[in-house]
């Protein structure tokens, strides 16, 4: 087995004609490890309905979706919007702002959103909602076999991310998770990527980063990782990943060898 920095196992990452030696794979969570629509689409619909039910407001719950980049009617998200690229705190603040702008007092809006989030999270069927992107489980398995470290950097809260990974049966293959609550500046700032690399004891220059948003790509670029790979489920999302070195549609296009 080849050895990389500080004697750690080194893998060879192949994507089409691109070949890179890596000590770690770093993944975004939502839209990269897990299908975004399945995980957050239903959650967003439930959240907006629950929020509307908690305040004296005659508006359409679906209209609040515009504040987070969620089209409830077409069941589609904006890959550049808060739901896709923002932290949970930012998403909740955006919904509360939408309520406030429609006439709900700010303190009531905040209370309604916080309570709705707790209620929805408690009622979600997480095993059904957490659908790994095609090929990602095989890639993680190959990483474990090759001794290549795996990290996750997410705009979600760390505890929620750990729960999601555990429910999906992936937690044992991930060496470190950095959520938005563990850093002072989230993606596109490089801080989360640097933090996960420190936790994995690898240099960013020896890591590959996979992400589905422009924030992911820019964070990896600024952190100085060896290769930034965009994960684009649709042409619309691919158009936002122009700063990536490579763009894939799923992980069946990725090969990791010892």
Give the location of each predicted region.
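Residues that cap or flank secondary-structure elements
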Residues: 87, 131, 153, 184-185, ...
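Asp-based, Mg2+/Mn2+-dependent phosphohydrolase catalytic module
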Residues: 2-25, 53, 137-145, 158-258
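Small/polar loops that bind or transfer phosphate-bearing groups
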Residues: 36, 152-153, 211, 232
């Amino acid at each position: 087995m080849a050895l990389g920095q500080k004697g750690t196992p080194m893998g060879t990452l192949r994507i089409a004609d691109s070949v890179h030696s890596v000590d770690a794979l770093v993944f975004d969570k939502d839209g990269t490890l897990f299908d975004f629509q399945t995980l957050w689409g239903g959650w967003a619909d439930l959240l907006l309905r629950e929020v509307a039910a908690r305040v004296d407001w005659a508006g359409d719950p679906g209209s609040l979706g515009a504040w987070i980049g969620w089209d409830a009617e077409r069941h589609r998200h904006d890959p550049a919007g808060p739901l896709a690229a923002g932290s949970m705190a930012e998403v909740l603040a955006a919904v509360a702002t939408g309520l406030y702008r429609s006439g709900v007092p700010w303190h009531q809006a905040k209370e309604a959103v916080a309570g709705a989030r707790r209620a929805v999270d408690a009622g979600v069927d997480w095993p059904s909602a957490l659908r790994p992107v095609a090929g990602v489980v095989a890639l993680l398995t190959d990483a474990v076999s090759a001794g290549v470290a795996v990290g996750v950097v997410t705009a979600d809260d760390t505890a929620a991310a750990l729960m999601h990974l555990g429910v999906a049966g992936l937690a044992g293959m991930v060496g470190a998770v950095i959520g938005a609550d563990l850093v002072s500046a989230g993606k596109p700032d490089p801080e989360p990527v640097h933090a996960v690399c420190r936790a994995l004891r690898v240099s960013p220059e020896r890591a590959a980063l996979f992400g589905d948003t422009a924030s992911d790509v820019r964070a990896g670029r600024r952190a100085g990782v060896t290769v930034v790979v965009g994960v684009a489920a649709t042409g619309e999302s691919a158009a936002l990943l122009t700063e990536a070195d490579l763009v894939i549609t799923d992980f069946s296009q990725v090969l990791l060898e010892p």
